Amino acid sequence: MTQLKELPLTTLQFYATAPYACSYLPNKTARSQVATPSHLIHADVYGDLLNAGFRRSGLYTYRPYCDECKACIATRILVNQFIPSRSQRRAQKKHAGLEVFVLNLGYQEEHYQLYQRYQHERHAGGDMDSDDQDQYMQFLLQSRVNSRIVEFRDGPHDPHPGRLRMVSMIDILEEGISSVYTFYDTSSHAASYGSYNILWQLEQARTLSLPYLYLGYYIKESDKMSYKIKYQPMEGLIDDHWQKLLGHNIYP
């Protein structure tokens, strides 16, 4: 892992959690390394942490710190080199009529209801399946960096104009956009909203002249996390260094 002494984070403290059941790989235990205190993790500091493999969940900033497993690999897409695949171009064309609204962080009941439906459909029985409003707000609406809510709604020529289809939370940092969390309408299983969201974020990063889109952790053996490798060229943080992630050099 990147040595913390190499980072300008002398005022932060770091601790390791006790082992807990892994959310992604069955019969595995996990640990996290947590950065604290949260009130000192502003945009510049969080950018350094992100480059060292950390992510945030609300005001909680962490990275995998497992004793033996190295399955979680922090990832980022090289924005200016990205070329969409055929299926990604189809998703882009399919949803070109969606209207996009970029908002400041704030609670909206419509967002929360979509979040609940998404969790019940896609992650039934998971840690977030029963999140109440307070848990939802702590997870997605608390931030000390430049964060935004992105709404995707049906356009005026769709059968249901204005219908909320997807919500994405993003952080806009000095070196890139970090995709925090996305949830969407699951009523159409072939909708490919998630793919369209990543393509939209890539385009926004390109517009802002930002070199990277950070997608979080890639886990080869997890269906929930393995899709990220489809967005190339991608870099992964392996053995303390960002390097091209092509599939052949990934931990099993």
Swiss-Prot record:
GO biological process: one example: ubiquitin-dependent protein catabolic process via the N-end rule pathway
EC number: 2.3.2.29
Keyword Ribonucleoprotein: no
Catalytic activity: N-terminal L-glutamyl-[protein] + L-leucyl-tRNA(Leu) = N-terminal L-leucyl-L-glutamyl-[protein] + tRNA(Leu) + H(+); N-terminal L-aspartyl-[protein] + L-leucyl-tRNA(Leu) = N-terminal L-leucyl-L-aspartyl-[protein] + tRNA(Leu) + H(+)
Domain of life, source organism: Bacteria
Broad EC category: transferase
InterPro entries: Acyl_CoA_acyltransferase, Asp_Glu_LeuTrfase, N-end_Aminoacyl_Trfase, N-end_Aminoacyl_Trfase_C, N-end_Aminoacyl_Trfase_N
Cellular localisation: Cytoplasm
GO CC aspect terms: cytoplasm
GO molecular function: arginyl-tRNA--protein transferase activity; leucyl-tRNA--protein transferase activity
Entry keyword set: Acyltransferase, Cytoplasm, Transferase
UniProt-listed Pfam families: ATE_C (PF04377), ATE_N (PF04376)
Transmembrane portions of the chain: none
Family the UniProt entry places it in: Belongs to the R-transferase family. Bpt subfamily.
Function: Functions in the N-end rule pathway of protein degradation where it conjugates Leu from its aminoacyl-tRNA to the N-termini of proteins containing an N-terminal aspartate or glutamate.
Stated name of the protein: Aspartate/glutamate leucyltransferase
Organism, as annotated: Polynucleobacter necessarius subsp. necessarius (strain STIR1)
Lineage of origin: Bacteria, Pseudomonadati, Pseudomonadota, Betaproteobacteria, Burkholderiales
